[in-house]
């Protein structure tokens, strides 16, 4: 789904047979979700929250972009029809089970944490991570961040603004290899909780997403090197995630009516030292979600709109900010490093 336009252009340039089949109207070009939904129900369609990531969708018109289709040489006839997030695809594999919702995982994660509440904001930390903000019923563009359809049905459409982080848990898999740490010995949250560092680590192995958008480069070590204490490097790696969250939140400030009082965090990477660091860095309390998989819960909420969840039980631990001059100096050091090495 991600950046499908350039992928389409590359494939038809490299494969003349594929190009001819597309030209003859024999094939649809679309994301995996569209392939699966058609395979299971026989209904062709790509829903809007995923279509947004193709570089072929015009978020203002709610349709495929004529400019982008022309740019990448994509014929509208080879694209599946656009459908809302909540849509009657039919029954799956001749069963009595209907397919009624197809949605992007980060959209579902925010719905799982905050429903469709306007102005809601949440974080999700898995292999990668993201900060998601419900911008309401008007598409909103923020420099450095991604704007998408958040939710849609036949009557209404909501939009979200999101900052993605390429490496969260995958960062620690990378450091296992770089530092020669066995996977079962990493325990990054334990290592980070007992260690402090003045160093800065910029993870370049998988590139940087929001708000810098840089392709892969060599990791940057500042006041660190691979001969440093490995726990210190792990701590600096964890802090890089927090710094990116802070940078994304600063990008969001102009479109938020007020500073959030609580930032909820879900996903397997939502561990105590990271959440405390984010709270200290941003000055916003961070709540650890009681439910590990908020993505699946988001789907449940869409399918059961009358279900009333108990918001008082949505977090089991709140990390309150502990302001300090040291954290301010560390943030400035990060920003200076990004200015020097990235921008």
Segments predicted by a language model, with ranges:
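Gly/charged, well-structured mid-domain segments that form the phosphate/adenylate-handling core
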Residues: 82-88
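A structural motif corresponding to the C-terminal end of an alpha-helix
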Residues: 71-78
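Active-site core segments that coordinate phosphate-bearing ligands/cofactors
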Residues: 2-45, 50, 55-66, 70-71, ...
């Amino acid at each position: 789904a991600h950046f499908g336009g350039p992928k389409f252009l590359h494939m038809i340039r490299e494969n003349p047979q594929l190009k001819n089949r597309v030209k003859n109207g024999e094939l649809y070009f679309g994301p995996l979700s569209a392939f699966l939904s058609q395979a299971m129900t026989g209904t062709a369609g790509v829903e809007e929250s995923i279509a947004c990531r193709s570089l072929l969708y015009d978020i203002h018109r709610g349709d495929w972009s004529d400019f982008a289709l022309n740019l990448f040489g994509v014929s509208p006839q080879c694209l599946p029809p656009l459908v809302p997030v909540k849509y009657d695809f039919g029954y799956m594999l001749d069963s009595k089970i209907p397919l009624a919702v197809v949605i992007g995982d980060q959209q579902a994660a925010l719905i799982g944490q905050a429903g469709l509440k306007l102005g809601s904001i949440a974080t999700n930390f898995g292999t990668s991570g993201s900060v998601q903000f419900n911008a309401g019923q008007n598409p909103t563009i923020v420099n450095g961040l991604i704007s998408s359809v958040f939710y849609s049905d036949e009557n209404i459409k909501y939009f979200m603004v999101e900052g993605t982080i390429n490496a969260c848990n995958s960062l620690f898999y990378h450091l296992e290899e770089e530092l020669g740490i066995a996977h079962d010995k990493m325990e990054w949250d334990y290592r980070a909780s007992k260690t402090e560092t003045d160093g800065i680590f910029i993870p370049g192995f998988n590139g940087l997403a929001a708000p810098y958008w840089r392709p892969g480069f060599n990791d940057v070590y500042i006041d660190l090197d691979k001969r440093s204490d490995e726990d210190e490097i792990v701590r600096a790696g964890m802090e890089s995630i927090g710094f990116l969250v802070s940078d994304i939140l600063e990008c969001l400030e102009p479109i938020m009516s007020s500073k959030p009082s609580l930032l909820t965090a879900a996903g397997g990477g939502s561990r105590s030292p990271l959440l405390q660091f984010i709270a200290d860095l941003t000055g916003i309390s961070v709540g650890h979600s009681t439910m590990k998989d908020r993505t699946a819960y988001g789907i449940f909420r869409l399918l059961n709109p009358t279900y009333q969840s108990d918001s008082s039980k949505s977090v089991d631990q709140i990390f309150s900010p502990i302001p300090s001059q040291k954290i301010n100096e560390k943030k400035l050091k990060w920003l200076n490093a990004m200015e020097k090495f990235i921008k």
